[in-house]
Amino acid sequence: MNYIYLISAALGLIGGVSGIDCGVKELKEYDFESIKGIHSVTTLKDTPPTQTNVTWYIGICDTISEKIDHCPKNSDLCGITSINLEKNSNKDAVVSEIVGFNTNLQKQYKPFTKDGDNNEDGITIVYKGANWGDNLVDAELRFVCASSSDKDKDLDKFQLHQWDDKRLKVSVKTKAACITDKKDKKKPDNKKDNKKGNDKDDNGESWGWFTWIFIFLVLFLSIYIVGGAWFQYSKGNAIDFQSALREVLENFVSLLKGLPSFVREIIEKFTGNSNRGEYSAV
C-alpha cells in the first residue's frame, strides 16, 4: 500500500461565518486569525483495482460551506471518503463516506506546555460525540507552537495521525498556537527605554506636586480674602474691596518673592548643605 499525504492550506474564505471560533476566551491568547480559512489534509490509499481518497477539511475561524461538495452545512470539520476508479484521478469518483463535526458541537480547549519528548507548547481542541449514522465519533485537533528552529515551509500544514471510524487525530505546527501577551509588547526592550519610562514617571510626579501647591495657594488666598472681609464687616466698618484686593496682591507678590529662599532653606536643612560661610566651628 502506498500512502501519499497531500496537505494544503486550501480554498481561502468560502462563504462561512463560524468554524473554529477564534473569538472564544480560550483562544484569546493565541493568533488563530493568522491562519484563518479552510485547510485540508488528504490521504490516498491503493485499493486495487481502485484508489481510496480520504480528505479532511478543517475550518479555522470559517465554517466549511456547502460549496465544498458533499460537506454538511455549518461544519467545523468535514471528512469525505471517495473511491477513485482511476488511480490519481478523481474523475467519476464515488463518495462512500461523509463525516461532519457541526460548529454547534460542544468543544473542549486543553492548553499544554512542555508536552512530549519535544517539550511542545500549544493547545488541543477536542470534539466529543458527533453523530455519524448510528455511531458517535470524536476528534482531536492539536495545534503546536512553532519554535525558532522550525522552517517556514513546514508550518501551517496539517497532518493526519489517526482515523479509524471512531476517532480523528490531526495536528499542525504553527506560530498561531504560540501564546502572545500584549503586555510584553509594551515592556521596554533596553535600558534606554527604561530610562525614558522613568523620566515620564518623574515628570508626572512633579506636575502632581505643582498642582497641589497651586491648590493650597488658591485656598489660602480665598480664606485670606473672605476672612479679612468678615473681620472688617464684624467691626462695623465699610469694606473697601479695592484696598483689600490691593493688599492681597501685595502680600501675594511678597509671598512669591520669598518662596524661592524659603524652599532653598528647607532643602538645605534636609540635605545638610547649609552654607556656613568660610568659618567652621572648632
Curated annotation (Swiss-Prot):
Disulfide bond residue pairs: C22-C61, C71-C78, C145-C178
Function text: Effector of VPS34 phosphatidylinositol 3-phosphate kinase signaling. Regulates the cytoplasm to vacuole transport (Cvt) vesicle formation. Plays a role in ATG protein retrieval from the pre-autophagosomal structure (PAS) and is especially required for autophagy-dependent cycling of ATG9.
Protein name per its UniProtKB record: Autophagy-related protein 27
Residues exposed to the Cytoplasmic side: 228-282
Alphabetical list of Gene3D superfamilies matching this protein: Mannose-6-phosphate receptor binding domain (2.70.130.10)
Protein family according to the UniProt entry: Belongs to the ATG27 family.
Primary localization class, coarse: membrane
InterPro entries given in the database record: Autophagy-rel_prot_27 (IPR018939), Man6P_isomerase_rcpt-bd_dom_sf (IPR009011), MRH_dom (IPR044865)
Organism, as annotated: Debaryomyces hansenii (strain ATCC 36239 / CBS 767 / BCRC 21394 / JCM 1990 / NBRC 0083 / IGC 2968)
Chain ranges of the MRH domain: 20-180
